[in-house]
Amino acid sequence: MAELRHSSSLGSRSSSSPLRAAGDEDSSSPHVHDHSPNGGDDEDGRPRHPSRDRDRPIWFHSLFPFFGDDPRVSPQKNKISLLLILILAIASLISVYGIINHLNAPYLCKKDGIVLNCPHVKESPSPWENPLSATTSWKPCAERRIGGISDLPPENETNGYVFIHAEGGLNQQRIAICNAVAVAKIMNATLILPVLKQDQIWKDTTKFEDIFDVDHFIDYLKDDVRIVRDIPDWFTDKAELFSSIRRTVKNIPKYAAAQFYIDNVLPRIKEKKIMALKPFVDRLGYDNVPQEINRLRCRVNYHALKFLPEIEQMADSLVSRMRNRTGNPNPYMALHLRFEKGMVGLSFCDFVGTREEKVKMAEYRQKEWPRRFKNGSHLWQLALQKRKEGRCPLEPGEVAVILRAMGYPKETQIYVASGQVYGGQNRMAPLRNMFPNLVTKEDLAGKEELTTFRKHVTSLAALDFLVCLKSDVFVMTHGGNFAKLIIGARRYMGHRQKSIKPDKGLMSKSFGDPYMGWATFVEDVVVTHQTRTGLPEETFPNYDLWENPLTPCMCKA
């Protein structure tokens, strides 16, 4: 009956607040039974103040009823509420962890299709350097371990000797040397100092020791690969190594995997004890090679391969003169202008010119590349397609318009690294009119200073390489090993220096639009190139190791 009366009493006060009703009943009704052992007291026997329950909001009682004293709450509801608290706690921890991770995440641009998305930065854009906050997340980590213990076996205990001809120009040879060290490491072979093969175009007979510091090269890699200066004395017929098919591995595919060398080349080296690899242009891949081998290639490229001291010193002088041409220290831009006759011909692209120029270029192409030329009837459509795809070299005038749209003023000091430009001064006129301060190494140094370096074409190329490498802004106009190695080295040095890679495909559309105004063109150029400046980005699959060494060769700072 008491329980029935309790219910009736609650019902009669239904119009009042539940909390107030409960409080009133506790104080006035003689029929209310106290279910706690101490009646209206707390667990320690002291009277419980009614405001304790009133201070808790309604949502608290509904979500966490087991904190209250309501006997009507079932054990099942208590379990559900406990589970809810546990889920909320885990979600909170995950959220906090995600926020901390986001705050500590290194700056890294990521590609979504053809669009490169980069994290937002607070700094105002600068024409001369990348934002500081975008360049502090990564550091080089391919240098050799100081005080490390070498696990290399003695020279007579390696699997044999490997020998390569480094073909092409200076930069192609540089890549071949890096790959040769990596291949020797993969096969645990001794590397014979690579021979720089005479280039058919440059007719240069430079030896390794004429351009690179051999002692530093061998010493820096002494814990990685066994390197000897010459073919061992016990191998008497040295001419055989240069010409004999029996001593040459010729079937190495381009961008071969490390496993290919272990399965196909190593057995022949073990059998013959000394083998030449030929040809050796781009004969080692990137993403099919262990990370430690890719890191070794960076070690060779950025640390072991140093130019001779006299080349380094002359380059430093050119850089200093370039910065101080106006009497005050100023930043300078380096422009790799690839518009030589050979490059224009090989591209099979169509360029502005007179009818006579076009006829002569057609004759030149037919002579140099007869199989590709055929009868010439298909070349026009091919040229249009290549231009749309961004596969044609930028003309000097096009480069000038792009740089002006990016905001570089007329007074900009520009170092030009280039061979003889196809079309001569007439072709260079638009660029020189917009940027009159165009400078070459011949303008910065006297004839006597360059005499020593003229003995070897590769020495002159090395000077261009170093002056471009140390510039505040580097601009490429077409692909190639020179630009690729420059951009990669500047990234490895910290991403701070801008390395601009024009989007030639998009620019061809803008140049070909007769209705596009200057303001719209400027906006297109700025938006397109704001992330094409050598910012941190994963190496694979968008880049090879030489243009972007981040993934295998750089660590979080």
Curated annotation (Swiss-Prot):
Name assigned to this protein: Protein PECTIC ARABINOGALACTAN SYNTHESIS-RELATED
What stretches pass through the bilayer? 80-100
UniProt topology in membrane:
Single-pass type II membrane protein
Following inactivation of the gene, the phenotype reported is:
Homozygote mutants are non viable. Heterozygote mutants display affected pollen germination.
Q: What domain of life does the UniProt record list for this protein's source?
A: Eukaryota
Cytoplasmic-side positions:
1-79
Compartment annotation: Golgi apparatus membrane
Tissue localization of expression: Widely expressed with the highest expression in reproductive tissues and roots.
Organism lineage reads as: Eukaryota, Viridiplantae, Streptophyta, Embryophyta, Tracheophyta
Where does this protein hold substrate?
A: H336, L337, R338
- What GO molecular function terms would the record report? glycosyltransferase activity
